[in-house]
């Protein structure tokens, strides 16, 4: 979920045939590390971030797989692009050669009605043909059934597998 935490965990696994996904927030100042070390980014919600990733992806590496993060709830405090703006961001990303637009990612609010999942699924279907999308990432451990019913091809079920995440305390 966090770039620095991921990099620390990646180091001892260097050389293994693993595919690395960033599913957490991506700040502009972390794009170089992500462009150089990850295979997927699930949380692109601004053209500026997409352009930085594209510019910083090393030549010779496969294109970075990208999911556009959609703000499913419409809450200003949540990350993601508004559904009405997804097509424009998708077009901008699709034009960047070192990125490969793969699909959409959304995190509906806890307890969201199934209709919220269906709305994002419908948006994915609308854009699928135009952009060649193949990945819809909806749902987590608590709502994976609703997500799959809405067409999700990738669910984030870390809590169901590993349990609740432990909070890391600052030493200061």
What spans do the regions from the language model cover?
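Conserved alpha/beta-domain cores
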Residues: 1-142, 148-150, 162-164
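Expand to "…catalyze enediolate/carbanion chemistry for C-C bond making/breaking, isomerization
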Residues: 148, 157, 161-168, 172
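Divalent-metal-activated hydrolytic enzyme cores
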Residues: 153-154
């Amino acid at each position: 979920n966090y770039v620095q935490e991921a990099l620390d965990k990646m180091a001892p696994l260097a050389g293994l045939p693993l595919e690395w996904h960033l599913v957490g927030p991506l700040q502009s100042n972390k794009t170089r590390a992500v462009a150089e070390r990850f295979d997927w980014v699930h949380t692109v919600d601004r053209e500026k971030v997409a352009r930085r990733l594209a510019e910083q992806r090393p030549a010779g590496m496969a294109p970075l797989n990208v999911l556009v993060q959609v703000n499913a709830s419409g809450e200003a405090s949540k990350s993601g692009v508004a559904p009405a703006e997804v097509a424009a961001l998708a077009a901008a990303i699709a034009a960047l050669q070192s990125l490969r637009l793969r699909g959409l990612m959304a995190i509906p609010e806890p307890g969201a009605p199934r209709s919220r999942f269906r709305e994002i699924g419908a948006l994915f279907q609308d854009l699928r043909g135009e952009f060649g999308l193949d990945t819809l990432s909806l749902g987590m451990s608590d709502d994976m059934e609703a997500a799959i019913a809405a067409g999700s091809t990738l669910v984030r079920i870390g809590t169901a597998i590993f349990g609740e995440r432990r909070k890391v305390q600052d030493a200061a």
